[in-house]
Each structure stands twice: as C-alpha cells, then as structure tokens.
Amino acid sequence: MSEDEAQFHGNYDDYVTYLKRRIRQLELQVRMLEADKERLERELSRLRSEMSRLRQPPAFAGSVIEVLDDDRAIVQNYNGPRFVVRIAPWIDKSKLRPGTRVALDQRTMAIIEILPASKDPAVLGFEVVERPNVTYNDIGGLKKQLQELREAIELPLKHPELFEEVGIDPPKGVLLYGPPGCGKTLMAKAIAHEVNATFIRVVGSELVRKYIGEGARLVHELFELAKEKAPTIIFIDEIDAIGAKRLDETTGGEREVNRTLMQLLAEMDGFDPRGNVKVIAATNRPDILDPALLRPGRFDRLIEVPLPDFEGRLEILKVHTRRMKLRGVDLRLIAELTEGASGADLKAIATEAGMFAIRERRTYVTQEDFLKAIDKVLGNEKKIIQQIMSHEVIYG
C-alpha cells in the first residue's frame, strides 16, 4: 500500500477527490511544459534563421542603368564595368528605374534587393525635428507677420481645397528678412508645429562646398529628404550665403556658390506648389540677394520681421515672464526702457533678471533685477558697438 493510500485508508471518497485534484495539477503542469516547449522551438527556429542569414555571403552594391525585357537589366557596379543581369522574381520591377540602387548577388550578379537612395551624411546631419514644440503662444509682437506666414504656408498644407476653389496656386516659398534675433526661426518652427510637419533647418553656409558639384548635390538630396518626410517645411537660415547676386567676374569658389544657387532655383521650380514641401528662408541682408530668387514662382511672399515696437516688446516680455514669479515689476516700464531691443535681447534680459534673483537667494524677481539686467544686456551691447566704431576710426 502506498503512502497516499495509507493516508486515506478507509476513506475512499476523500482519496478519489485527492486523486482528481492531483490529476488536474499534473495536467496543468503538462500544458505549461508544452507551452514552454513551443516557445523554445520558436526561439530555436528564429536563431537558426538568424544564423542562416548571417552566413549568407555579402552582396555587391550597384545602380540600374537600364531595365530590359525578359526580366533583365543593365547594372553597373560602383567604379566597375556594366553587366546584363537577371532580376529576381520577388523584385517589384515597377520600382526599378535608371539610377536605382540595388544589391547584386555575389556569384550571379542578379538583382536580389532594392536599396534605399543614398544620401550624403551632411544631409542626414541637418537638424530634422519631427514636430517642433514651439507654438504661436511662444511668439509675441508679430501678429501681422504670423498671419501672412500662415496664409502662405499653413493654409496650403491644411486646406489646399481653398486654393483650388479660387483657382490660384499658393506661394512656393516665403522669405523672412529683418534684423537678427527678431523671431524668424521661431515663426518657422511654430508653423511646422501647427501643421504637424517635419522641420528641416539648414544654414546657408552648410550648402557651400569645396569641390565642384558637391553643393548642388546637397541641395538636391535635401529636397529628396524633404519629399520622403512630407509634409515638410525646409527652413534655410542665412540664405544670403548662397543667394547673393551673381557677378560677371568670379573666382572658383564663387562659381561653385553660383552652381549651388542655380540648383536651388531648379529645385524650387521643379516641385508642385500644392505639394507637401514648403520652403521658408531668412536673411539679414535682403539687399544683396539675387533677383532670380525673389521673382514670382520661387519666394513669392516677402515678409519683413522688424524690431518690435512698444506693444510688441510688451507682448514678448509677457511671453518670457509668464512662468516667473514677479513682485512689483512694471512690464510697461521695462518695455519703455528697452527701445531698440530685439526679441532675443528681451529674452536675455528676462533670463539675466532671474539670475540676479538666484544670486540673492530669492525665488521671485523684482523690478531692480530687471533694471540691472537691462543695463547688463543692452549696456554691454552699446559699449561693444562703441569700441568697434572707435577701432575702425583709429585703424581705418
């Protein structure tokens, strides 16, 4: 007699109940073990597949020259000869065009995969923000300029049917011009946030390259990247670096800049004004820009972003102080004392006022902190300008 039987000797009902419970426990353990077995078999299959993939020989990279009939194509291995090769049956032939990058089998040179288009690392290094966190509430004193920018950029992206009903094409690009620090970049980011668009910021000097054709290629790949991530807003800051007036007498470097400019003009002529790519450019020197940039069909709308007036300075101060604890601060007086200051200057003044409060171990900012900040930010600026002017007078 087993121990279980001895335990329930003479009480068969309890023994039967115990056996049923034990059977259920064993069945549950069996199901758990079967589930573990299936999981481990799937993991084994995945690892075997991964091992098989890693053991595959490397493929050559090439480009399609011409697509032929009978599932064949002419391809060229980079820096190598041309081959007439077969196209693998799983390749979508409609996607094969001259210039398409493909992977070629090492042994048969057959096309076995379509590769993504190549991009210069400099293009991939441009500042790409999927959706900026700047909103219209972060901008003060630029209501008129924002309205004009929204009409040219936001409306075509969000409500293209309005332009179709009226029968006009929206502007392809907008040029923002004015002194530095007045909010041109902020306006572009706010528009990108509102339309939920990708924001690509490029400085004009980044498109200037040493060797012939490199700058033009960068511009082309920049617009290709924008089309892939559409809807996209391309913001070209300091466009005067590549968009200055072309002269008859040029050096080698200036000729390369002119080639880059011509590529930019060609790209802006080549995309649909009702498409999902918009261009915003900014400059502090609109007087030196090439007239070809400013003609209708490229930068159709020119928006001046001037230094803020009294009401504009007051709005900007309210924006930058809305999270600050103020005690006895008259923002209207601060706005009067900062005549000629840009939006960036006003932000610096608010930051310096907060730093003065921290220096005094306070959690609130007073009027005196702002007065010290004004003297520090604007006073130093005036002193620097005076020093530069006196230096020019002395040394000519």
UniProtKB/Swiss-Prot annotation:
Q: Name one Pfam family in it.
A: AAA_lid_3
- Specify whether Nucleotide-binding is a keyword of the entry: yes
Cellular component terms (Gene Ontology) = cytoplasm; proteasome-activating nucleotidase complex
Does the keyword Zinc belong to this entry? no
Coiled-coil-forming residues are 16-57
Its GO biological process annotations read: proteasomal protein catabolic process; protein unfolding
The compartments listed are: Cytoplasm
Task: Give the UniProt keywords, A-Z.
Answer: ATP-binding, Chaperone, Coiled coil, Cytoplasm, Nucleotide-binding, Proteasome
Q: Which GO terms describe its molecular function?
A: ATP binding; ATP hydrolysis activity
Record family assignment? Belongs to the AAA ATPase family.
- Which NCBIfam families does UniProt cross-reference here? PRK03992.1, proteasome-activating nucleotidase
Role description: ATPase which is responsible for recognizing, binding, unfolding and translocation of substrate proteins into the archaeal 20S proteasome core particle. Is essential for opening the gate of the 20S proteasome via an interaction with its C-terminus, thereby allowing substrate entry and access to the site of proteolysis. Thus, the C-termini of the proteasomal ATPase function like a 'key in a lock' to induce gate opening and therefore regulate proteolysis.
Oligomeric state and interaction partners are given as: Homohexamer. The hexameric complex has a two-ring architecture resembling a top hat that caps the 20S proteasome core at one or both ends. Upon ATP-binding, the C-terminus of PAN interacts with the alpha-rings of the proteasome core by binding to the intersubunit pockets.
What name has this protein been given in UniProt?
A: Proteasome-activating nucleotidase
Look up and give the organism this protein is from: Pyrococcus furiosus (strain ATCC 43587 / DSM 3638 / JCM 8422 / Vc1)
